[in-house]
Amino acid sequence: MGRRSFIRGTGSYLPERVLTNDELSEMVETTDAWIQERTGIKKRHVAADGELTSDIAVHAARRALEAAGMQASEIDLIVLATTTPDQTFPATATAVQAKLGTGPGAAFDVQAVCSGFLFALATADSLMKQGLFHKALVIGAETFTRIIDWSDRGTCVLFGDGGGAIVLECVEWDGADDAGVITHHVRTDGTKSNLLYVDGGVSSTGTIGHVRMEGNKVFKHAVTNISAAIEAVLTETGLTSADIDWFVPHQANKRILDGVAKKMSIPEEKVVITVSEHANTSAASIPLALDHVVRSGRAKPGDLILSEAMGGGFSWGASLFRL
């Protein structure tokens, strides 16, 4: 008998303020048609003044707890994936812990940009399987619009703010191997960090900086690396894409989603796409999309889900789990 983690609930949150493509066209040289054709994005949400990453995370976490039928006091682990923390330190997860009023336990951040949620999920799952923790919140939350150069049309049209969360519970398990959280594949190639980065930092410039990206190169690496991560998970488990009920990818842009689906021969109807409604929310996008497909009733208990992502670093990965 071993230990197995199960997803007990999902939740998400998007700030009230909506920024449309037409509004962006008044700020930079672009159009709604240009943005939609190249990215599939129609709008993005922007955090209000004074609305922190921890606030967004708390909203998403509360909804996940409600869906799980659990109280915050039952949680003994919080792993928060974010690139846009409230402060340099302490970890934003500690603010989430305090605001939620969770029980005694651990709370820390993981930073792997757009693939951060998968790294956070793999970390929480590993710690729980060791018996160190029993009930966890795994959260992705971002105020990414605060590191955007609004004069750079190559990046400012792509990103938005938001948060998503899941509740994980780890229990003694002697059942089927393909139940709950099944496996993860995470990788990083630091030699490509100059292709997608923020040009500022505490120890380098002493400034916050803005997102800089070589879009065409990022696209090519994303399709290649994400496809490789999917293949690694399928090979490890002896599955094929036909066995997967839903692919819930990082919502970067529709061109990348379509490129991966084509390369891996994944039917379009199996791919969950929400990027049109909230743009690229970095670490928040996978739990946002997962919550969407669950609450819409499309994904049902027992469905097999594969999530995949790539972000700056480059860091990428995939996780396989059954609802």
Swiss-Prot record:
Region (ACP-binding): 251-255
Record keywords, A-Z: Acyltransferase, Cytoplasm, Fatty acid biosynthesis, Fatty acid metabolism, Lipid biosynthesis, Lipid metabolism, Multifunctional enzyme, Transferase
Domain of life, source organism: Bacteria
GO MF term set: 3-oxoacyl-[acyl-carrier-protein] synthase activity; beta-ketoacyl-acyl-carrier-protein synthase III activity
SUPFAM superfamilies: Thiolase-like
InterPro entries to which the protein is assigned, alphabetical: ACP_syn_III_C, ACP_syn_III_N, FabH, Thiolase-like
UniProt xrefs under Gene3D superfamilies: 3.40.47.10
Active site residues of this protein: 114, 250, 280
PANTHER family xref list: 3-OXOACYL-[ACYL-CARRIER-PROTEIN] SYNTHASE 3, BETA-KETOACYL-[ACYL-CARRIER-PROTEIN] SYNTHASE III
Quaternary structure note: Homodimer.
Function description: Catalyzes the condensation reaction of fatty acid synthesis by the addition to an acyl acceptor of two carbons from malonyl-ACP. Catalyzes the first condensation reaction which initiates fatty acid synthesis and may therefore play a role in governing the total rate of fatty acid production. Possesses both acetoacetyl-ACP synthase and acetyl transacylase activities. Its substrate specificity determines the biosynthesis of branched-chain and/or straight-chain of fatty acids.
NCBIfam families per the UniProt record, alphabetical: fabH, PRK09352.1
Protein name stated in the entry: Beta-ketoacyl-[acyl-carrier-protein] synthase III
Organism from which the protein derives: Hyphomonas neptunium (strain ATCC 15444)
